[in-house]
Amino acid sequence: SVTGYSDAATQLMNDIGLNEDFLNFMDTSTSEDLALVGNFDANNGVALPGAGDHFMYAGNWNATMFGGEGYEQVIESLPLPSGEKEKLIAFWGGKRDFLEGLSLSEKWDYLNSVSYNQFLIDKVGLLPTTVPILNAIIVHLSGMTGWNLTVGEALLGGASGITSLGWLGKATASAGGAFLDRLLKIRMFPDGNASVARLLVQKLIPNVAPEVRGPANIVAARFNYDALDQASNNTRLRLNSTAVGVRENELGTVEIDYVEQDSPKRVIADHCILACYNGLIPHLCPEMPEPQKAGLAYGVKTPFVYANVQVRNGKAFSKAGATLFQCPYDPFQWVSCAPTVAVGGFEPPRRPDDPMVIFMMHSPMPMTKPDPKLSTRDQLRLARTEIYQAQFSDYEQQIREQLQSMLGQFGFQHQSDIEAITVNRIPHGYAYPYVKLDDPEWEAGQAPHEIGRAQFGRISIANSDSEAVALMNAAFDAAYRAVEEQTA
């Protein structure tokens, strides 16, 4: 959505056809029962391991976590100790102030200095084994857990409990509500933001797909990759070319060394924008000042694993009763039907008899309390290492076991029903956002990403890392700034 976008980002969206009219069309083309796009009225559930198969609740789990209608009955049905159920009912009901006894300033300090999970254990009284149930939504939206975020950060990021903090919580609830409102405005192409990248490329190099009529048929359009790097193009895009060195020479031009098909090559340009992972830039451009290199190296991207599982039909998933399940105790914490969006020339499956794709998300961040000596950045590095060390066979086994336990009770047989699995390891995912438990509050202009993105002669820095915001519009804003720097 363009809501909240800068003028530059909004103009870019309009230039590639993603204006308000088309976004409204996307709304009408998205299935109303698709919870993945933030439709909190759609059936969404929770899956908890049981003695045999998973316990599956399908209704409105998100509403339950915020004290929605019937939340007490839902909690009573969960396979949890009776004492834990009572605590969840009290916490989600919003009828009690769990920071009672603290002054307003003490509450504010608590919200900004104690982790969400520690709050759940110390103040709400939950057992550590129950805490993951309240973490699944945080993991999906931030890639971190309630051990990494303060109470305030977690609540403003969509976690439950904001109405259980007395007057301060109710005053803060409007900010949390604004966050949920933004969730409700999510628009999604069937291939995610890949369609946006394809629209940008086609706008710059029309011959790559002359038949494209903007976003209306971008998903199904075939691209001619041979047209990307033609000398006659105003814009050239060179694939399979890994940059290994960038420097401004004594002639006032920029030399970019790269490797293409094991062959070292060099291109010379008047200007260069490094729109890549910030952590790589000190290695690409070692001539930069040490403080700038330190700023670039500070952030650690949040790792994820996304899996898509093609199954023979959607009968078992349909019988489960929801389009999305939170799975707090499983390797893949979110399991959903893939985006059922009829847009861009793509026609999704619509009936249970049709083949379907199940989308699964795994965060490797520890759900149990981490070593207090490890900062969030340390934990992100360890999580990244876990992804690198895992084999496809490891993920395949996890996927098969989890889906069988969840859907077997509805007739699913993983041996015959799964037709294909793709696993997308994303060791360098979301831009690092800073967390209050670990990072100081820097003065304006002195945060590591701000120092790191300083113009370095004819070289400028872009990408969402340079904004410390893991959103597409942040990358647009960074690109605009970098181009403005080099054309001023």
Residue ranges and their predicted role:
Residues 3-12, 18-24, 112-116, 122-127, ...:
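Conserved beta-strand->loop/alpha-helix structural units within folded catalytic cores of enzymes
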Residues 133, 148-153, 167-170, 283-287, ...:
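Short, solvent-exposed loop/turn and secondary-structure capping segments
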Residues 83-241:
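Active-site/ligand-binding neighborhood in enzyme catalytic cores
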Residues 1-109:
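N-terminal glycine-rich phosphate/pyrophosphate-binding loop and immediately adjacent elements
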Residues 49-51, 259, 310, 316-488:
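Conserved flavin/dinucleotide-binding core of flavoenzymes
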Residues 1-3, 102-110, 182-191, 292-298, ...:
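Active-site rim elements
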